[in-house]
UniProtKB/Swiss-Prot annotation:
Key words, A-Z: Amino-acid biosynthesis, Arginine biosynthesis, ATP-binding, Cytoplasm, Ligase, Nucleotide-binding
One GO process term, biological-process aspect: argininosuccinate metabolic process
UniProt family annotation: Belongs to the argininosuccinate synthase family. Type 1 subfamily.
Pfam (any one): Arginosuc_synth
Protein name: Argininosuccinate synthase
Subcellular localization, as worded in the UniProt entry: Cytoplasm
Enzymatic reactions: L-citrulline + L-aspartate + ATP = 2-(N(omega)-L-arginino)succinate + AMP + diphosphate + H(+)
Cross-referenced HAMAP family: Arg_succ_synth_type1
InterPro entries found in the cross-reference section: Arginosuc_syn_C, Arginosuc_syn_N, Arginosuc_synth, Arginosuc_synth_CS, Arginosuc_synth_type_1_subfam, AS_cat/multimer_dom_body, Rossmann-like_a/b/a_fold
Summary of subunit composition and partner proteins: Homotetramer.
Length: 406
């Protein structure tokens, strides 16, 4: 394939690894390279990526830096949270949900620039290679895919650094740069590697980049109100913001109060177990609030069906099938369930905890105090329960009469 590629679009961060990939593509494939850097809220200045690409010989017209923050939250994060999606009971899918948007945009740039190939920096051990490549092929099945980590022999840090030095790639470390493998966007930041590769070893406190330790969080709690329309967050404390602005604000509140830290061992799609630590402050608050709103606006069986389907939906996202017909079918069902998910949720934030202290919906609440009061009521005849119970016990009664023992 090396002699067949004419132009390749590289998912480029400006960091050491993707800068090495850029040079490697030029040398090994002898092709024109286009760089694409996505701003999905990782919190880093992106202009250095442009300068780095220029220094490595990339033409100005072949450098693409795109602000995708609002699209990321509106079209990916919010739809996922309508489903209350959690992978293996804990993981809020912060890395998984970002990959489809990057892959889609990268494929679009390939079409725009006439590139016949795309490339990414995901390793051959992880899930991201699957997520990126499923996304590419969903948009353009004719694209050639170059995954350097599956091809080259630069399989150690020493070899990578030696290659960088040989080709004049800057390897100076930024002051305060974390030694962990990290990935960040508006939804979360993740940490892998080093001491975390021993699941018995506790993460060090200085690893956490975003949030205060719950022990160091304010001694005073903070009460906030979140407004929802059709399952999506629209305002915080009455203030309407853009989708990215809303998640940014929730992150600030969560970080302040030590919310959203997670240390898990997860099952990767490729088959191995992997330990990761995550900070998802805003997402943790959002999930709790959304479920609280659904508790008063969703019909019981609709809510239970959603809960049954959620693990499948979460696995599809984790494994890279965002653009699959089955995910879209589930999304249509989920979105239908959110028509009445309108209202306000009041929460109290305190030292790592998110506590629901109120929920209301002016027009869509199914909670009716007249039916569930412990006081005398005029709408519910308690004698009706006897027949309901007897009918539901009928199979037990028949089995018992036939001598069955339970």
């Amino acid at each position: 394939m090396k002699n067949e590629v004419k132009k390749v679009v590289l998912a480029y961060s400006g960091g050491l690894d993707t800068s090495i990939i850029l040079k490697w593509l030029q040398d090994e494939y002898n092709c024109e390279v286009v760089t694409f850097t996505a701003d999905i809220g990782q919190g880093e200045e992106l202009e250095p990526a442009r300068k780095k690409a220029l220094s490595l010989g990339i033409k100005e017209e072949n450098i693409f830096i795109k602000d995708l923050r609002d699209e990321f939250v509106k079209d990916y994060v919010f739809p996922m949270f309508r489903a209350n999606a959690i992978y293996e009971g804990e993981y809020l899918l912060g890395t998984s949900i970002a990959r489809p948007l990057i892959a889609k945009t990268q494929a679009q740039i390939a079409l725009q620039t006439g590139a016949d190939a795309v490339s990414h920096g995901a390793t051959g051990k992880g899930n991201d290679q699957v997520r990126f490549e499923l996304g590419y092929l969903a948009f353009n099945p004719d694209l050639k895919i170059i995954a350097p980590w599956r091809e080259w022999d630069l399989n150690s840090r020493e070899k990578l650094l030696a290659y960088a030095q040989k080709h004049g790639i800057d390897i100076s470390k930024k002051k305060g740069k974390s030694p962990y493998s990290m990935d960040a966007n508006l939804l979360h930041i993740s940490y892998e590697g080093l001491v975390l590769e021993d699941p018995a070893h506790a993460p060090e406190e200085d690893m956490w980049r975003w949030s205060k330790s719950p022990k160091d969080a304010p001694n005073e709690s903070e009460i906030i109100e979140l407004d929802f329309q059709k399952g999506d967050l629209v305002a915080i404390n009455g203030e309407k913001l853009s989708p990215a602005g809303l998640l940014t604000k929730l992150n600030e509140l969560g970080c302040k109060h030590g919310i959203g830290r997670l240390d898990i061992v997860e099952n990767r799609y490729v088959g191995m177990k992997s330990r990761g630590c995550y900070e998802t402050p805003g997402g943790t608050i959002l999930l709790k609030a959304h479920r609280a709103l659904e508790s008063i606006t969703l019909d019981r069986e609709a809510a239970h069906l959603k809960d049954e389907l959620m693990p499948k939906y979460a696995s599809l996202i984790y494994n890279g099938y965002w653009f699959s017909p089955e995910r879209m079918m589930l999304q249509a069902l989920i979105d239908e369930s959110q028509i009445h998910a309108n209202g306000r949720v009041k929460l109290e934030l305190y030292k790592g905890n998110v506590m629901i202290i109120g929920r209301e919906s002016a027009n869509d609440s199914l909670f009716n105090a007249a039916y569930c009061t412990f006081e005398e009521d005029e709408v519910y005849n308690q004698k009706d329960a006897a027949g309901f119970i007897k009918l539901n016990a009928l199979r037990f009664i028949i089995a018992g009469k036939n001598g069955r023992k339970f």
